[in-house]
Amino acid sequence: MDAKTDDQGGKCPFPHGGGSRGHRNRDWWPEQLDINMLHRNSTLSDPLGKAFDYAKEFESLDLDAVIKDLHALMTDSQDWWPADFGHYGGLMIRMAWHSAGTYRTTDGRGGAGAGQQRFAPLNSWPDNANLDKARRLLWPIKQKYGNKISWADLYVLTGNVALESMGFKTFGFAGGRADTWEPEELFWGPEGSWLGDERYSGERQLHDALGAVQMGLIYVNPEGPNGNPDPVAAAKDIRETFARMAMNDEETVALIAGGHTFGKTHGAGDPSLIGAEPEGGALEDQGLGWKSKFGTGFGADAITGGPEVIWTQTPTQWSNFFFENLFGFEWELDKSPAGAKQWKAKGAEATVPDPFDPTKKRVPTMLTTDLSLRFDPAYEKISRRFFENPDQFADAFARAWFKLTHRDMGPKVRYRGKLVPKEDLIWQDPIPPVDHELVSAKDIADLKARILASGLSVSQLVSTAFASASTYRHSDKRGGANGARIRFAPQKDWEVNQPADLAQVLGKLEAIQKAFNDAQSGGKKVSLADLIVLGGSAAVEKAAKDAGTEVEVPFTPGRMDALEEQTDGDSFKVLEPRADGFRNFIGKRHQFMQPEEALVDRAQLLNLTAPEMTVLLGGLRVLGGNVGHDSHGVFTDRPEKLTNDFFVNLLDMKTAWSLSATAEGVYEGRDRKTGDLRWTGTRVDLIFGSHSQLRALAEVYGQSDAQTKFAQDFVAAWTKVMNADRFDLAAK
């Protein structure tokens, strides 16, 4: 047989070189539900392996030695990237700030907790220009101490040391941020170009999910909204974006003024002379970006953005000069050598040092967003108080900096190292330590029996336990069942938590708690937080037994009940779900995702895999977990029994599905022969039969031999959610 191919000339029919690649599935079907986020940063991408315990490694670190080396680094100027004013402090503060400053309260994502700044897209954001140099300057120290300190911790620690080395007393430092090993691929905005601002609607309404004003910025445009040098208008952007990072006005003023006490911005020349960002660079650039053709490209010729601003007379020393200059001068609009809008002190003497020539001086300069602290009425009051009371300013900046760099770490039980502050802060969502003997296995069995005899249904117990635990966000480690904050506002009043039912369940559980605790003589107690979870466990076991399957739901006591004064109700508002596919709930607030997308998003926040998401949803449907007790997705005639009926009936080809003509967002499943209505479901339900990957998972649980596996896998996923915030268990 002739081995030659017809018109290929014997050549391989697949393209090579030139960056060619075939189309991915999403190129063909861009509207396909993406569930890849459920499997990113798994142990498969972690080179350190499952057994590696970063918290333990950090505890063995000689922290004093690292800090000493960082102090030495600050003034060890390198020829390939010289230090401004002979000190890298300003650069390192910016690196740490921009590592933490991506945090957003909406979903808890972003922040310093995972060392994501070294990955795309953050490593190539315009606002992070030349921070690649800061990270390369740190490499010898990271290399020296290896796995005992993560990049994530090193970024934040370096920022602290930079401040300390310039005479500022920080509030403290906590280690414990384990590195991740691949980009998170978050939704940073709808724009397809850097600095795009299609995220606004109406009268400058910023997209609900986002925390910055333009693609590739951490917060705001320093030249003003869309480059308009209006300090008052800029203040509106500042207030909005900093609030979405959990900062109030005082913290915002302290952070801006404190951070801008040090260092400078870089706009020495034409920005068009800057080369590609790190991800767009050539192979030989080895991950360094923004190579500049302006002069030497570094030092006095450095270009990071547009403005060329030095705020204070002592840019490597803590001072009150920022406020002295802000209020001491009148300001006139100017342009940097790069053509950016900025402000200079009107009629001022040249008192600010040049970063590289000790014989030269400059006049003080400010950004439009700096002047916002004077010309916005609310900011002005705070700024003037800080100006007149430097000690208050220093304390406010220290606390705000600590909050900025630790906000996404979760509760203090996750903090590591000897520099952890002793003071409890309300934004840490404190929970009292265990101060009593915990219940025994015998007590647990007794409490389960009392709960099941209380008249509460499987549906009520499961719904309450899930409502309590599913507030957890793995992104910033907030929420969860520990603390039993579901009994406080705002959670007790959320529509998704069915307030009337919730009040009834909590009332009966509190009565059981009181009766049990009052009967103890040796100080043994059970918390309501534990009892809520135990009630769900008892209900799941009963539902499985009623379906003919024996299961034991693991339960570990040790949760405590938070006090109302330990709960910042306003800060918990962001945990309220707009939609919750696990409970077939769509709220009244604006939805910016399809219901099935919101389900995947929520599953990722709960740290669930696709199989765990699948089995958990299927189980909750038959257990009566829907909000409002509606029947959508309840594909069973055996409710409150832990069966695999959801999958069996969804996959049944005797049923034909169509969009309801009378109910929005509802699908009707009718008998193919008779047309009789069998079931109703939502997009969240039907996606498990429509999406090929999710259907494959559903088929595992819809098989004839699947009942036992289904029950066991449901229990495992359920327990994972119930224990998601039990960092005390992980620490043991």
UniProtKB/Swiss-Prot annotation:
Record's GO cellular component terms: cytosol
Cross-linked residues, Tryptophyl-tyrosyl-methioninium (Tyr-Met) (with W-97): 219-245
GO process terms (BP): cellular response to hydrogen peroxide; hydrogen peroxide catabolic process
Enzyme category, top tier: oxidoreductase
Disulfide bond sites: none
Site feature location: Transition state stabilizer: 94
Protein family per UniProt: Belongs to the peroxidase family. Peroxidase/catalase subfamily.
Subunit relationships: Homodimer or homotetramer.
Name this protein carries in UniProt: Catalase-peroxidase
Classification of source organism: Bacteria, Pseudomonadati, Pseudomonadota, Alphaproteobacteria, Hyphomicrobiales
